UniProtKB/Swiss-Prot annotation:
Compositional bias of kind Basic and acidic residues: 188-197, 205-270
SUPFAM superfamilies: beta-beta-alpha zinc fingers, WW domain
Localisation per UniProt entry: Nucleus; Nucleus speckle
Basic residues composition bias: residue spans: 112-121
Protein name: WW domain-binding protein 4
Domain WW residues, every copy: 121-154, 162-195
Listed GO biological process terms: mRNA cis splicing, via spliceosome; mRNA splicing, via spliceosome; RNA splicing
Organism phylogeny: Eukaryota, Metazoa, Chordata, Craniata, Vertebrata
């Protein structure tokens, strides 16, 4: 049988990031070591610090949400004061938010809630009448969620229901998300409650607000002859109470534009009674809308003066003169030449002769030669 080599099993330590032999004595010896114990203690402290940081972040987020709710309630109170209405809502005390996990509803509970919701909607009726902030009546469909200005067929007056005080109020957060606020308990949540009834303070779509001009005038003229004085008083009371539930957190200028829009269109629709007076009247200049960034200003370029300015630039005449003077002022250098008449006379009277270097044995002296001893 052939011999073969089998490797010893090894184990990786996650704390020390090293490999050790996978047997009981080696593992116990490594775990009893000082370095391993220090690494384990360091890892535990890191996990503890991370959990503390996470708890601090959650506590900070809960405080920020509580501050947002308080600011929303404060803005709501200011809007009511600006509109001259009294609020029956008392400012709720902000309690620290605890991180509690709500039990998830079972399927049976959800089915029961849906059945109760359907029964409530069937008992209330399909259409509900509401009043906007401007005092205009609109109709809301509980089944489809659609709203319209025209009175639906077979609708019976439901002003008493809209005039009743609602518990839940719909609002918009700073990010544009809708949430629901309980006026009695001060609770707020993102999901739509079961007993929520839409009111005039709810946010309408821009398409519904554009249908205001003509349909409202026709419906008012037709309903004014049929309705009695008592119904008008009830409608006024209902509009006054529903105005209390209006919450406007973003783009407050939109409400003023919506109010100005119908008034301008009414002035256009009214016939001209005295044409002579209108000709005499001067056209009114439209009011300039205030811009937070300021108004545009036209920049006018000033005509540059054509006065000659002395830039003190060098003239060409001076350059020509300087070049001519430089050419004339050049000095020629004369070099002296020295000639050697003779190389000298030796003592014997024989002229010196240049001798060639002798080469030993036909080899030059600058090359290293092997000596005799070598």
């Amino acid at each position: 049988m052939a011999d073969y080599w089998k490797s010893q099993p090894k184990k990786f330590c996650d704390y020390c990031k090293c490999w050790i032999a996978d047997n009981r004595p080696s593992v116990e010896f490594h775990e009893r070591g000082k370095n391993h114990k220090e690494n384990v203690a360091r890892k535990i402290s890191e996990i503890k610090q991370k959990s503390l940081d996470k708890a601090k972040e959650e506590e900070k987020a809960s405080k920020e949400f509580a501050a947002m709710e308080a600011a929303a309630l404060k803005a709501y109170q200011e809007d009511l004061k600006r509109l001259g209405l009294q609020s029956d809502i008392s400012e709720p005390t902000i309690s620290p938010v605890t991180n509690t996990v709500q039990p998830t509803p079972t399927a049976n509970q959800q089915k029961e809630k849906k059945k109760k919701k359907k029964k409530k909607e069937a008992s209330k009726g399909r259409w509900v009448e509401g009043v906007t902030a401007d005092g205009h009546c609109y109709y809301y469909d509980l089944v489809t969620g659609a709203s319209q200005w025209e009175k639906p067929e077979g609708f019976q007056g439901n002003l008493k229901k809209t005039a009743a005080k609602a518990i839940w109020v719909e609002g918009l957060s700073e990010d544009g998300y809708t949430y629901y606020y309980n006026t009695e308990t001060g609770e707020s949540k993102w999901e739509k409650p079961d007993d929520f009834i839409p009111h005039g303070g709810d946010v309408l779509s821009s398409k519904d607000s554009e249908k205001l001009p003509d349909t409202l005038e026709d419906s008012k003229s037709s309903d004014s002859h049929s309705d009695s004085d008592d119904e008008q008083k009830k409608a006024g009371e209902a509009s006054a109470e529903t105005k209390k539930l209006i919450i406007k957190f973003k783009e407050k200028n939109k409400s003023t534009e919506k109010r100005i829009g119908p008034e301008i269109q009414k002035e256009k629709t009214t016939p001209k009674q005295n044409p002579s007076n209108t000709n005499e009247e001067k056209p009114k200049t439209p009011k300039k809308s205030t811009n937070p960034y300021g108004e545009w200003q036209e920049i006018k370029q000033e005509a540059e003066s054509q006065e000659e300015v002395d830039l003190e630039l060098p003239s060409t005449e001076n350059e020509c003169l300087s070049s001519s003077e430089a050419g004339a002022g050049e000095i020629k250098v004369v070099f002296k030449e020295k000639t050697v008449s003779s190389l000298g006379v030796a003592a014997d009277g024989v002229a010196p002769v240049f001798k060639k270097r002798r080469i030993e044995n036909g080899k030059s002296r600058n090359l290293r030669q092997r000596g005799e001893d070598e």
